[in-house]
């Protein structure tokens, strides 16, 4: 089993799929698939107090939507299940007892009050809290007596106080820690469930995990993990600790602070492919100029040794740009299908939405921008006549009024209202008046939209609005300009 690359995504069902969690899943998936390996889903629910109802569905749905399909997991089974930690309780107790037999762990009966006192003393001395090994030398008789009396206990790792523990991480290199800094961490809690740290090591070994991908915040725990591997006589997996994702230079991206989850980004109109592509580049450098990768290309190109140590800043502008690239790469039909719900939300008039899609397809970066681009189609917005003055277009109040008054009867006479016919009428007027295009087209665009920036120009907007509405808006424009005289 260990000859084959096996990675795992092991989330806790505690709420939304945070961007950092999704990147961990993606990197683990890419490492496995780059070498035709297995990607395993394991649910870490040992911290029962933090569990959130419905969070498990979020995990399954996210993996399904993103296409990060697991080869083994709670929902599909596999050869090394169960894949939910709360269903493996007896396994952890068995392995904790093996450590006690080896002299690598011990029972601790210290009360909450005693531990609170130790913590308070540590805080007063401004030192990190470490358990004082009070129960390390209890005799078998004392232990048996306390267990028989029903005294609550935990099982702790027995760490040496001299020497050092070293480990290698593929991103951060060789790291060595003095054993005197290692706390005798709890392996089995008083409720009989394992701690996250202990369950991880046992499960990663029993499930044949070859590469452990996780955030750099777990670097400090890795020496304790290594001590467990050594105590059991197990091979240590390859560690890939990923740099943190930052909101800006000084603040980490955090779901506690309400920063974007995968669900939030999808709800804002980002495409799943763009989100995954962008997240892949948060810390990983493929080399070269290429930035837009399909999943197949990511699998082929991904090399975890090219992950940077430096924190990656989540740049919403960059994500938006990338999303725009993906939207433009869609077929018009596919874009139209994705835009339809936004049209239904934004439009109050019966318009040709396929024509609107032709306008927006190359102009929208995020689907949620669609409604704000369409407001003028419903009703002509109140606007200032000053909009008719445009230095670059060489328009004034006077020539704007002339253009609108000249084009109105020509458009009124148009029997077949199409884009091409509207364009022909307007361009013929440009020739007749012997002016630059903008002198005619800018006033028309202003009159029909009431906005300085619109998707599409005068011809497209007039075509979509229809004859009656276009003529009505041009008349309003004429009246606005006449009122200035």
From Swiss-Prot:
Q: How is the cofactor bound?
A: Binds 1 zinc ion per subunit.
Q: Where is this motif: 'HIGH' region?
A: 11-21
The reaction(s) catalysed by this protein are: tRNA(Glu) + L-glutamate + ATP = L-glutamyl-tRNA(Glu) + AMP + diphosphate
Residues the entry annotates as binding Zn(2+): 108, 110, 135, 137
Q: Cross-referenced InterPro entries, in alphabetical order?
A: aa-tRNA-synth_I_cd-bd (IPR045462), aa-tRNA-synth_I_codon-bd_sub2 (IPR020751), aa-tRNA-synth_I_CS (IPR001412), aa_tRNA-synth_I_cd-bd_sf (IPR008925), Glu-tRNA-ligase_bac/mito (IPR004527), Glu/Gln-tRNA-synth (IPR000924), Glu/Gln-tRNA-synth_Ib_cat-dom (IPR020058), GluQ/Sye (IPR049940)
* Source organism of this protein record: Clostridium botulinum (strain Loch Maree / Type A3)
Kindly list the places in or outside the cell where this protein is found, as annotated in its UniProt entry: Cytoplasm
| Any one GO CC term of the record | cytoplasm
| E.C. designation(s) | 6.1.1.17
Output the PROSITE patterns linked to this UniProt entry: AA_TRNA_LIGASE_I
Q: What is the lineage of its organism?
A: Bacteria, Bacillati, Bacillota, Clostridia, Eubacteriales
User: Which parts of the sequence bind ATP?
Assistant: 255
Function, as annotated: Catalyzes the attachment of glutamate to tRNA(Glu) in a two-step reaction: glutamate is first activated by ATP to form Glu-AMP and then transferred to the acceptor end of tRNA(Glu).
Just give the chief location class: cytoplasm
According to the lineage, what is the superkingdom?
Bacteria
Question: Could you identify this protein by its name?
Answer: Glutamate--tRNA ligase
Locus of motif 'KMSKS' region: 252-256
Query: Which family does the record claim for this protein?
Result: Belongs to the class-I aminoacyl-tRNA synthetase family. Glutamate--tRNA ligase type 1 subfamily.
Drop me one GO molecular function for this one: zinc ion binding
Q: What does the annotation say about its assembly with partners?
A: Monomer.
> Which GO BP terms apply?
glutamyl-tRNA aminoacylation
What is its cofactor? Zn(2+)
């Amino acid at each position: 089993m260990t000859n084959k690359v096996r990675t795992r995504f092991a989330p806790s069902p505690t709420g939304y799929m945070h961007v950092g969690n999704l990147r961990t899943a993606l990197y683990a998936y890419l490492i496995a698939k780059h070498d035709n390996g297995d990607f395993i889903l394991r649910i870490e629910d040992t911290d029962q107090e933090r569990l959130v109802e419905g969070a498990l569905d979020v995990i399954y749905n996210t993996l399904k939507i993103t296409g990060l399909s697991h080869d083994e997991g709670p929902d599909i089974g596999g050869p090394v299940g169960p894949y939910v930690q709360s269903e493996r309780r007896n396994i952890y107790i068995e392995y904790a007892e093996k450590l006690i037999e080896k002299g690598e762990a011990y029972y601790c009966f210290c009360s909450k009050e005693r531990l609170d006192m130790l913590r308070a003393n540590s805080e007063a001395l401004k030192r990190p809290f470490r358990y004082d090994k009070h129960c390390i030398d209890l005799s078998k008789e004392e232990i048996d007596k306390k267990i028989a009396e029903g005294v609550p206990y935990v099982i702790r790792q027995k760490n040496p106080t001299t020497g050092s523990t070293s480990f290698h991480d593929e991103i951060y290199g060789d790291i060595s820690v003095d054993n005197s800094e290692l706390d005798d961490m709890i392996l089995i809690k008083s409720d009989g469930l394992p701690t996250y740290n202990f369950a991880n090591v046992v499960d990663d070994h029993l499930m044949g995990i070859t590469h452990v991908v996780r955030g750099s915040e777990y670097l400090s725990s890795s020496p304790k993990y290594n001590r467990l591997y050594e105590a059991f006589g197990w091979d240590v997996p390859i560690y890939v600790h990923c740099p943190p994702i930052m909101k800006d230079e000084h603040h980490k991206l955090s779901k506690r602070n309400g920063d974007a989850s995968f669900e939030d980004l999808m709800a804002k109109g980002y495409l799943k492919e763009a989100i995954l592509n962008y997240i892949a580049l948060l810390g990983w450098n493929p080399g070269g100029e290429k930035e837009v990768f399909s999943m197949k290309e990511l699998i082929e190109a991904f090399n975890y040794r090219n992950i940077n140590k430096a924190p990656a800043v989540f740049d919403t502008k960059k994500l938006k740009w990338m999303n725009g690239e993906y939207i433009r790469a869609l077929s018009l039909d596919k874009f139209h299908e994705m835009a339809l719900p936004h049209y239904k939300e934004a439009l109050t008039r019966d318009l040709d939405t396929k024509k609107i899609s032709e306008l927006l397809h190359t102009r929208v970066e995020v689907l949620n921008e669609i409604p704000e681009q369409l407001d003028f189609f419903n009703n002509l917005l109140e606007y200032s006549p000053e909009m008719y003055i445009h230095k670059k277009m060489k328009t004034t109040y006077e020539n704007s009024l002339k253009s609108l008054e000249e084009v109105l009867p020509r458009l009124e006479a148009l029997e077949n209202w199409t884009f091409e016919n509207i364009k022909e009428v307007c361009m013929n007027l440009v020739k007749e008046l012997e002016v630059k295009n903008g002198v005619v087209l800018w006033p028309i665009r202003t009159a029909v939209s009431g906005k300085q920036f619109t998707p599409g120009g005068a011809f497209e907007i007039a075509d979509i609005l229809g004859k009656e509405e276009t003529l009505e808006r041009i008349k309003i424009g004429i009246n606005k300009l006449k009122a200035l005289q």
